[in-house]
Amino acid sequence: MTRILVLFHSWTGSAYRLAEGVAAGAREVDGCEVELKQVPEVVSDAVLKRAGALEPRKEFAQVPVATIDELPSYHGFAFGTPTRFGCMSSTMRSFLDQTGHFYAEGKLIGRVGTVFCSTGSGGGM
């Protein structure tokens, strides 16, 4: 069985809804076991509240949070993030930055990956 991880970060729910679609499509492939997870949030609740993100995040609060150590158990990845000033979110970046030791150890060699993003407004709003 091929294990696929659809991993996302979202504040407003847009990247979450995209992740649901990616996961649904991947589940249509015979022989694939697909898991949908979110990255651990690194931004404080105070900042999330000021940004208006606490309420929208309730939509996907039930989605399990991924850990770095589980990544080598998957055969493929789809990473989803909103854009922040043209870049991935700092939360997704923080998660991925913690995977360097897997590269050094060769633990993710041969894995397949893709990315998707949501974006919607200018000026970082």
What are these regions (language model features)?
Residues 1-107:
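N-terminal beta1-alpha1-beta2 submodule of the flavodoxin-like/Rossmannoid cofactor-binding fold
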